Amino acid sequence: MYVVLEGIDGVGKSTQIELLKSAFQNALFTKEPGGTKIGETLRHIALHENLSELARAFLFLSDRAEHIESVIKPALKEKKLIISDRSLISGMAYSAFSSLELNLLATQSILPAKIILLWIDKEGLKERLSLKSLDKIENQGVEKLLHIQQKFKTHAYALKEQFGCEVLELNAKENAKNLHERISAFIQCVV
């Protein structure tokens, strides 16, 4: 089963991934972008080189295609539980070019069975961003991140409606232990 954790930077995905590693020790943990050696190179270019938005979008699509082919497909064939930090949903939410058709091509129409969507309100986001050094995306400001967060929700629920992906939406301001318990229960109801 393919499960993804989604949400804007600062909502606690990394914290939850670390907690899930203890709870699901036999799972394959991966990430997008950069879940393969080639993906790491593509991610670095996309994030650090001066590229057009279209070129950047195609680099991320290339990373996604390689990740699906070399990581996700083999693990699904072996009937493994796959837990990914981000997926095509992030790609569509962060990009100005959020083509579902291109993402379906890149993923060979392999979609997550379960989507865990962490969200946060404006005040919570401001508080969390004040506690860390900001990257290029986070430096775009709170309003931009909240707009991107809305795109996450739109894309996650579109996948639910069109393809039957299950969605668990959680307020990231809840305490990490409670979030972990709810996320684990959501994953386990099929495992």
Swiss-Prot record:
Keyword Transmembrane: no
Top-rank taxon: Bacteria
Cystines in this chain: none
Pfam families named in the record: Thymidylate_kin (PF02223)
One GO biological process term: dUDP biosynthetic process
Gene Ontology CC: cytosol
Function: Phosphorylation of dTMP to form dTDP in both de novo and salvage pathways of dTTP synthesis.
Family named by the database record: Belongs to the thymidylate kinase family.
Protein name as catalogued: Thymidylate kinase
Species this chain originates from: Helicobacter acinonychis (strain Sheeba)
Phylogenetic classification of the source organism: Bacteria, Pseudomonadati, Campylobacterota, Epsilonproteobacteria, Campylobacterales
